[in-house]
């Protein structure tokens, strides 16, 4: 069994989601018999490990759920360099979402240090996080994408009125979001010019680029892709897609992570042909971006044609997340999924 450090938390708006993901990963890895070291990345940039672990409590001792919860209430931060020099882990399992945890930053940090990690590499992480660049790659690979525009803060500051007029050409409703973001934390459904002007000003208070995209009415589905080695060969498989029935106007943050916020139906209630097509396109998106290990792509099916929305390189791994739901529907345990992710991370570091 391996010594595995689990990174979760982070400074992004998805901090709370990542904590839930980290807890799920730690518990699952522990049931697999691995030695688990939970590492909380705080919102202010600190790196925290359970206090008793840092005074040489064995790996196994920090796997108690009670100790885990109690110790994170009274931890002290450690510097990144002190932490890395004493990491003593075979691989880092990334349970981060959004921001520097998913945009290639932490991946680059670990790569420079020569520390193996799970999930996609630097380039794929950065491309997938940049919604505009990702859409351009999807279009080049032949995928259908709803019309969109990107706006930079400088252009908006110089001419707010022209920016609003440009985005109005997409029609209403439209979806406005930061170019680099995930989990629909800052995604807004815009229905009129006044709302568009107001939300642009608000988003640019904290983000440098935004993207707005035309609304598509249809069936929303999400499809996970897993990589694994079988008989010495790497293979990619698409999981059964999940149909998303939002409790609100769209599948926003509340719908994704609040109990009862949405209905998630796995497998999706779509035709066999549509399911096959969605799975093919999910693998295509995974491959086009250069993802590794796993990913999850979201689509809207309009008139039988899937239109891709985005690809997540570090999809959620909470109790209610879609990848665990889809793996279960495919007869694959999360222990199998995690074992494959670890194997791929270790093999890639060797190459």
From Swiss-Prot:
Top-level EC class as recorded in UniProt: ligase
GO terms, biological process: cell wall organization; peptidoglycan biosynthetic process; regulation of cell shape
GO cellular component annotations of the record: cytoplasm
Residue span(s) of domain ATP-grasp: 135-343
Binding site for Mg(2+) 2: 310, 312
Stated role: Cell wall formation.
The protein's name in its UniProt record: D-alanine--D-alanine ligase
Gene that this sequence comes from: ddl
């Amino acid at each position: 069994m391996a010594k595995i450090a689990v990174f979760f938390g982070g400074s992004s708006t998805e901090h709370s989601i990542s904590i839930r993901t980290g807890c799920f990963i730690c518990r699952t890895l522990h049931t697999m018999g691995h030695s688990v070291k939970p590492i909380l990345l705080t919102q202010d940039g600190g790196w925290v490990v359970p206090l008793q672990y840092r005074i040489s409590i064995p790996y196994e001792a920090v796997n108690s759920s009670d100790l885990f919860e109690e110790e994170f209430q009274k931890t002290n931060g450690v510097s990144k360099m002190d932490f890395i020099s004493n990491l003593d882990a075979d691989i880092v399992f990334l349970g981060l979402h959004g921001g520097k945890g998913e945009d290639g930053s932490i991946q680059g940090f670990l790569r420079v240090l020569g520390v193996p990690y799970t999930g996609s590499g630097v380039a794929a992480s950065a491309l997938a996080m940049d919604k505009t660049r990702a859409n351009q790659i999807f279009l080049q690979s032949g995928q259908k994408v709803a019309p969109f525009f990107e706006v930079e803060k400088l252009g908006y500051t110089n001419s707010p009125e022209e920016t609003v007029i440009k985005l109005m050409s997409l029609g209403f409703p439209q979806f406005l979001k930061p170019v680099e973001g995930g989990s629909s934390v800052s995604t807004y459904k815009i229905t009129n010019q006044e709302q568009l002007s107001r939300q642009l000003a608000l988003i640019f208070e904290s983000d440098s680029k935004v993207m707005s995209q035309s609304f598509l009415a249809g069936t929303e589905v999400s499809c996970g892709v897993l990589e694994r080695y079988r008989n010495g060969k790497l293979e990619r498989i698409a999981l059964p897609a999940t149909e998303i029935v939002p409790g609100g106007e769209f599948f926003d943050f509340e719908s994704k992570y609040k109990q009862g916020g949405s209905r998630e139906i796995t497998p999706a209630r779509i035709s066999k042909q549509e399911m096959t097509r969605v799975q093919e396109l999910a693998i295509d998106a995974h491959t086009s971006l250069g993802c590794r290990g796993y990913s999850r792509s979201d689509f809207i099916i309009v008139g039988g044609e899937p239109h891709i929305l985005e690809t997540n390189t570090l999809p959620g791994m909470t109790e209610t997340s879609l990848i665990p739901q889809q793996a279960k529907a495919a007869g694959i345990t999360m222990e199998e999924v995690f074992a494959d992710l670890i194997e791929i991370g270790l093999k890639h570091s060797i190459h």
